[in-house]
Amino acid sequence: LWSG
């Protein structure tokens, strides 16, 4: 999971 990537967040940014």
UniProtKB/Swiss-Prot annotation:
Keyword set includes Secreted: yes
Its GO CC terms?
extracellular region
**Which molecular function term from Gene Ontology is one that the record holds?**
toxin activity
Disulfide connectivity?
none
Q: What's in the keyword line of the UniProt record?
A: Calcium channel impairing toxin, Ion channel impairing toxin, Secreted, Toxin
- So which residues are the signal peptide here? none
The record's subcellular location field reads:
Secreted
What coarse category fits the chief subcellular location reported for this protein?
secreted
Describe tissue expression.
Answer: Expressed by the venom gland.
Query: Is this entry keyworded Signal?
Result: no
Query: What is the protein's known function?
Result: Specific inhibitor of store-operated non-voltage-gated calcium channels.
Q: What is this protein called?
A: Tetrapandin-1
What organism does this protein naturally occur in? Pandinus imperator
Task: Tell me the lineage of the source organism.
Answer: Eukaryota, Metazoa, Ecdysozoa, Arthropoda, Chelicerata
